[in-house]
């Protein structure tokens, strides 16, 4: 059953007349009064109380420009790691020592990239492809390219859990004694620092003004061979 992807009804059994057979038995709010009676704290405009498509914008509602970048950057998870806390588990890093920059083969061919070639990830608000740690150290945002048919053309993906600058990934001096870094903990790439900044706030990424969460899937980037 698992090999088939699940257990399924015949298509015709899913319907009773013009309605679905398995109905959702609870209340579904298509209009949310709490949202509709709340103002956007940045613009003063009323929020929508109903489902609507809202184009990507900064905190003032202004459209986002991507400076010619065309590849859509997204993130994903790997079954081997949590978001960040398991890079110290060497049983797991032995299975997959680093993550990769995943792109579709058609994009790789168009950009002149090949499997295992390293590439920089640049964006409109991080054209230098570097992560400024604020202590005089800047880390390059560069990783190994891997093509995959399972990713949509025009999309760039990296899995979370790699590309650390802490957790022992860099040298640390404690009470005058050097604690040397472990290169295994720094392996791979973490491209969060490439993600688009809010043009008005400037020191934070784009955010969902209704829910308050960070926007991880609306940055467009450029890949440059390293």
Language-model segments: which ranges?
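Long, contiguous, secondary-structure-rich segments that constitute the structural scaffold
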Residues: 1-4, 13, 17-24, 30, ...
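Long, low-complexity segments enriched in small/aliphatic residues
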Residues: 1-89
């Amino acid at each position: 059953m698992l090999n088939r992807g699940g257990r399924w009804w015949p298509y015709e059994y899913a319907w009773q007349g013009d309605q679905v057979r398995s109905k959702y038995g609870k209340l579904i709010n298509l209009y949310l009064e709490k949202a509709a009676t709340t103002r956007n704290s940045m613009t003063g405009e009323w929020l929508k109380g109903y489902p609507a498509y809202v184009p990507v914008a900064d905190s003032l509602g202004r459209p986002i420009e991507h400076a010619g970048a065309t590849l859509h950057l997204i993130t994903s998870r790997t079954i081997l790691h949590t978001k960040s806390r398991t890079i110290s588990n060497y049983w797991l890093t032995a299975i997959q020592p680093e993550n990769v920059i995943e792109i579709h083969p058609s994009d790789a061919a168009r950009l002149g990239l090949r499997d295992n070639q390293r590439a920089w990830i640049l964006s409109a608000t991080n054209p230098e492809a570097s992560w400024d740690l604020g202590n005089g150290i800047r880390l390059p945002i560069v990783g190994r390219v891997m093509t995959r048919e399972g990713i949509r053309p025009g999309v760039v993906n990296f899995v979370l859990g790699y590309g650390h600058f802490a957790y022992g990934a860099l040298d640390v001096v404690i009470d005058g004694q050097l604690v040397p870094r472990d290169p295994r903990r720094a392996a791979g790439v973490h491209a969060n620092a490439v993600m688009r900044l809010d043009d008005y706030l400037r020191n934070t990424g784009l955010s969902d003004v209704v829910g308050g969460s960070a926007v991880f899937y609306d940055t467009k980037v450029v890949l440059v061979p390293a």
